[in-house]
Swiss-Prot record:
It comes from Wolinella succinogenes (strain ATCC 29543 / DSM 1740 / CCUG 13145 / JCM 31913 / LMG 7466 / NCTC 11488 / FDC 602W) (Vibrio succinogenes). Substrate binds at residues 16, 52, 95-96, 140, 166. The lineage of its organism: Bacteria, Pseudomonadati, Campylobacterota, Epsilonproteobacteria, Campylobacterales. GO terms for cellular component: cytoplasm. PANTHER family: PHOSPHOSERINE PHOSPHATASE. One of its GO terms (molecular function) is L-phosphoserine phosphatase activity. One of its GO terms (biological process) is L-serine biosynthetic process. Its cofactor is Mg(2+). Pfam families: Hydrolase. Mg(2+) binds at residues 7, 9, 163. It catalyses: O-phospho-L-serine + H2O = L-serine + phosphate; O-phospho-D-serine + H2O = D-serine + phosphate. This is Phosphoserine phosphatase. Transmembrane segments: none annotated. The gene is SERB. It is an enzyme of class 3 (hydrolase). Keywords: Amino-acid biosynthesis, Hydrolase, Magnesium, Metal-binding, Serine biosynthesis.
Amino acid sequence: MKLAVFDFDSTLMDGETIDILAHHYGVGEEVDRITKGAMEGGLDFYESLKRRVALLRGMELSLVEEICANLTLMEGAKELIQELKRRDYKVVVFSGGFKNATSKARETLGLDADFSNILHHKEGKLTGEVGGEMMFGSSKGEMMQTLQRLLGISPELTMAVGDGANDASMFPFAKQRVAFCAKPILREKANIIIEKKDLREILAHL
């Protein structure tokens, strides 16, 4: 058994969930600026996440669910996941984004698990607060170590795939470190670099 851990936004999914939600809610430009800073490593991930989610306060939960049910998967996602499963990989998503989106992708792609954050809501509207397992820049690396211990899978048999600064904490615990159409801060830590927006490109490196 092997382990493959994927980032969600701009990796398994083509785009950033919070940016898409923000554009529907009319706060897109403000959120875009914060997201860009976070992914390039210029802003602390925890602070940037809190600031972005706060801008969604008052958004209807039903609209959030509708948007998250219709997010576009990255080119080649289904084919890559199917092949990984065929090769006896446990396939998991770690996301600094939201359960509303990752749980639907888990069902669609047949992932083994999804770890992400929760958008708090009250009376059918977002409160502007967020909590969960992936709140910090170090969260993905910590969760990967926990998962490896639970499953009895070594870093030698682990692949990590991501695109942004908050994916870097996974890389010390994975033999295959895939930077997928990634920011420079992640590319310099990778040993596999994919330039084309097609996850099937990873198949050649398995």
